[in-house]
Amino acid sequence: MSGTRASNDRPPSAGGVKRGRLQHEAATTGSRVTVVLGAQWGDEGKGKVVDLLATDADVVSRCQGGNNAGHTVVVDGKEYDFHLLPSGIINPKAVSFIGNGVVVHLPGLFEEAEKNEKKGLKDWEKRLVISDRAHLVFDFHQAVDGLQEVQRQAQEGKNIGTTRKGIGPAYSSKAARTGLRICDLLSDFDEFSSRFKNLARQHQSMFPSLEVDVEGQLKRLKGFAERIRPMVRDGVYFMYEALHGPPKKILVEGANAALLDIDFGTYPFVTSSNCTVGGVCTGLGIPPQNIGEVYGVVKAYTTRVGIGAFPTEQINEIGDLLQSRGHEWGVTTGRKRRCGWLDLMILRYAHMVNGFTALALTKLDILDALDEIKVGVAYKLGGKRIPYFPANQEILQKVEVEYETLPGWKADTTGARKWEDLPPQAQSYIRFVENHVGVAVKWVGVGKSRDSMIQLF
């Protein structure tokens, strides 16, 4: 037996500690993040839910997207609009973190901050941390975004309906491994300048009409570099410290929504990032075991901006009523949102992908004026129910929606502050959603302000 080890022997663990205990500790130590995600096509009211949870959070994070997102938060009668900044930046006690999965347009970041400063936002620079691995969006990315939309319209007679914020082109540069990151900007500026010029030339070769003021943009970027330098950290280490140091409440604010996810959304009419729960891990550099609560935010009806399949859309007086009562214009684009009945197939699909632990049902008050309310409960193809959400857009356009009709409540719910204040028919509507999706509703929104979110448990 000399020089050999019996088959049931194991090499000693470091320090003689039993391997099983190490594995257990590795799997269970650390805080867990609370995630807020959109469950439809965006504009569900995620910012309001985040604002509610951010009041006692220590860290509020963004993990994907860019300034194509739009979150509105009302505090003390003041309406703040956020696109790139986490809406938790309002909390003076919390650190706001922009993770590596976010693409950052620096001029847009400072413009957004300055607009909100005029409304009362203070000392945001002291509370903002930006991952050094986050990719940059340049002005020419935004110009290319617009040129691509024009091309698509000319070639196919339709466009994707992007926000023209350069998000898709920036993620394309990232995937092509030609993109530039925050850490590159803060390192050797001569090297950064060389790579920036090459990237600009690449885009000009693809789009001959593209004009790029290379020297002007580099001058601006050099100025921005010094402004953001104090905010930049190694993002992975920052999150590791937050998770494994003294216990902290960490909140993740998802941008966009499940049906806009690059993989699971209604492709190609989607955004360019993963806005489902998997994007939290890749966009912040954290392991799955540190995901805790996952809250899905759902509007009490359905809206969508731009083109693409929308099975429950109401192109009639119902759609017009929802649009006008709900003030359905995009925060980022100002575009009118398409409106329709609540679609439970979408919610069940979003739950399959995200594993929601609870839902927030927002804008219930918009339904106050309706005599009856329809809810899409199933899709049919060829007269037969299908148990899945179709990936193919042409098929999704053809589905027949099976509806159930519920009685309206014809009463003002905006003053409700607890479950008992809601009309019985409104309570039945909420329970109907819970039963069909299989997830409990934790909050019900009946207005814009922070105190108009009714907590059920």
Curated annotation (Swiss-Prot):
Positions of region (Disordered): 1-25
Binding-site residues, substrate: 43, 331-337
Subcellular location as annotated: Cytoplasm
Residue sites binding Mg(2+) per the record: 43, 70
Entry GO terms, CC: cytoplasm
Active site annotation, chain numbering: 43 (proton acceptor), 71 (proton donor)
Domain of life: Eukaryota
Pathway where this protein functions: Purine metabolism; AMP biosynthesis via de novo pathway; AMP from IMP: step 1/2
UniProt subunit comment: Homodimer.
Keywords associated with the record: Cytoplasm, GTP-binding, Ligase, Magnesium, Metal-binding, Nucleotide-binding, Purine biosynthesis
Co-factor remark: Binds 1 Mg(2+) ion per subunit.
GO biological-process terms attached to the record: 'de novo' AMP biosynthetic process; IMP metabolic process
Job of this protein: Component of the purine nucleotide cycle (PNC), which interconverts IMP and AMP to regulate the nucleotide levels in various tissues, and which contributes to glycolysis and ammoniagenesis. Catalyzes the first committed step in the biosynthesis of AMP from IMP.
Similarity field: Belongs to the adenylosuccinate synthetase family.
Binding site for IMP: 43-46, 68-71, 163, 177, 256, 271, 335
Protein name: Adenylosuccinate synthetase isozyme 1
PROSITE patterns linked to this entry: ADENYLOSUCCIN_SYN_1 (PS01266), ADENYLOSUCCIN_SYN_2 (PS00513)
Metal-binding keyword on record: yes
Residues that bind GTP: 42-48, 70-72, 337, 363-365, 445-448
InterPro entries associated with the record: Adenylosuccin_syn_GTP-bd, Adenylosuccin_syn_Lys_AS, Adenylosuccinate_synth_dom1, Adenylosuccinate_synth_dom2, Adenylosuccinate_synth_dom3, Adenylosuccinate_synthetase, AdSS_1_vert, P-loop_NTPase
Any one GO molecular function term: GTP binding
Cofactor: Mg(2+)
Reactions it catalyzes: IMP + L-aspartate + GTP = N(6)-(1,2-dicarboxyethyl)-AMP + GDP + phosphate + 2 H(+)
The EC number(s) this enzyme carries: 6.3.4.4
